[in-house]
């Protein structure tokens, strides 16, 4: 059991787990997440993903929902356990050890430290007092003794690794909570249509009505921005959302995710305007909508109407695929199959993405703790001891970070002590 705990808390195991989680996240970014199963089968039927995985294998490996898959959550749990064990076995004892005072009593003990210096002075005890005063002004914590001194600075840096581990655990807990308890809903909503969100008991939680939807396009006709004006059932003021500017309301985040064409208004002959639903035709292109429209009362002699934007034009094709004419929304009628056909309007639809993720506050807290711990980890923990003996002041020190800089600062510190001596006797500095 002890060997298992030692292995789980090994830093190398945590690094391997982090790499696996990063690799899994990259896969989740490369493969679309949350689409219908048939879309993966169709997408990877002829061209397997990376030349290895067909659609069925993608589904079997749960790569269509990586972040909520059992194996991904298992990796997060394993990493969380490894971090907790590492903190318990390594970081917590290191913090406790840093908080304990070590009492070095003899010059011989100091000479074995990573940094050691000795100055010769007529009054070593006065030099010890001067050293204590200099260190106190620099913010060191002191513990004086009989003819000796212990000092430390930056012990708070030892808290940094613990906070880093705590932040990572909180972050992973928030991610798991969001994956298990969160909800995601994608819907296309036409203007003046309402989307009702129901609780598990069937009660209405929130109603969202699309009051207006605008598509901003560049001079070439490419969409640049989408804007939706939403009316919420529990709010008197409409809220506008756009790409990269979502709405957060009662724990639900509403994103402007996409757009589509919902319906087309046509007039055949002297008929009133007929609003007919459009459907997508992926075989004709990524963003092609259309419908089959009969031109006779018995449903015969149909024509096919297709368009790529709400601005048109609307292409009209015969049943054999030959082009008949082009129609502009709101423009004049054109004769098709002996009847005047006019496109009165095209109704766009707003693609809304609704997310409820209860783990987000925990994720934010985890990031904050992680950043705080990372900052504190940069603080070097320095320890210094001094012993006055036989007209000499022996000084030694340890540092867990940037030892070379501390080794350069220690002689300068001793020079300040020497400069404050009130005696005129010669002094020398020797490296031990």
Curated annotation (Swiss-Prot):
Keyword entries, A-Z: Cytochrome c-type biogenesis, Membrane, Thylakoid, Transmembrane, Transmembrane helix
One Pfam assignment: ResB
Membrane topology: Multi-pass membrane protein
Chief location: membrane
InterPro entries hit by this protein: Cyt_c_bgen_Ccs1/CcsB/ResB, ResB-like_domain
Compartment annotation: Cellular thylakoid membrane
Superkingdom, taxonomy of origin: Bacteria
Family from the record: Belongs to the Ccs1/CcsB family.
Its biological purpose: Required during biogenesis of c-type cytochromes (cytochrome c6 and cytochrome f) at the step of heme attachment.
Protein name: Cytochrome c biogenesis protein CcsB
Name of encoding gene: ccsB
């Amino acid at each position: 059991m002890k060997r298992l705990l030692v292995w789980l808390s090994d830093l190398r195991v945590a690094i391997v787990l982090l790499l696996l989680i990063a690799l899994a996240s990259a896969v989740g970014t490369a493969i679309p997440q949350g689409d219908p199963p048939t879309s993966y089968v169709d997408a990877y039927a002829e061209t397997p993903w990376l030349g290895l995985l067909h659609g069925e294998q993608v589904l079997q490996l749960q790569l269509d929902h990586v972040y909520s898959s059992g194996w991904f959550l298992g990796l997060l749990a394993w990493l969380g356990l490894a971090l907790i064990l590492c903190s318990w076995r390594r970081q917590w004892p290191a913090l406790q050890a840093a908080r304990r005072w070590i009492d070095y009593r003899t010059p011989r003990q100091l000479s074995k430290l990573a940094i050691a210096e000795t100055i010769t002075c007529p009054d070593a005890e006065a030099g010890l007092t001067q050293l204590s005063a200099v260190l106190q002004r620099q913010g060191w914590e002191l513990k004086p003794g009989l003819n000796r001194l212990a000092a430390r600075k930056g012990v708070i840096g030892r808290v940094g690794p613990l906070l880093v581990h705590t932040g990572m655990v909180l972050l992973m807990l928030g991610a798991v909570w969001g994956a298990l308890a969160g909800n995601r809903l994608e819907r296309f909503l036409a203007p003046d249509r309402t989307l009702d969100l129901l609780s598990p008991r069937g009660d209405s939680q929130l109603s969202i009505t699309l009051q207006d939807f605008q598509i901003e396009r560049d001079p070439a006709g490419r969409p640049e921005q989408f804007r939706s004006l939403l009316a919420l059932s529990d709010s008197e003021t409409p809220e506008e959302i756009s790409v990269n500017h979502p709405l957060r309301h009662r724990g639900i985040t509403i994103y402007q995710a996409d757009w589509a064409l919902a319906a087309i208004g046509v007039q055949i002959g002297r008929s009133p305007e007929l609003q007919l639903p459009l459907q997508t035709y992926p075989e004709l292109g990524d963003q092609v909508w259309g419908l089959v429209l009969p031109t006779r009362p018995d449903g015969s002699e149909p024509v096919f109407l297709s368009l790529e934007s709400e601005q048109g034009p609307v292409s009209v094709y015969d049943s054999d695929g030959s082009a008949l004419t082009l129609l502009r929304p709101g423009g004049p009628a054109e004769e098709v199959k002996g009847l005047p056909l006019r496109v009165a309007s095209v109704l766009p639809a707003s693609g809304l993405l609704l997310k409820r993720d209860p783990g987000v506050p925990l994720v934010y807290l985890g990031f904050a703790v992680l950043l705080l711990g990372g900052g504190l980890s940069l603080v070097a923990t320095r320890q210094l001891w001094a012993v006055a003996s036989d007209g000499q002041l022996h000084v030694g020190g340890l540092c867990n970070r940037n030892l070379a800089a501390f080794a350069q600062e220690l002689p300068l510190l001793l020079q300040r002590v020497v400069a404050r001596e009130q005696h005129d006797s010669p002094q020398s500095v020797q490296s031990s």
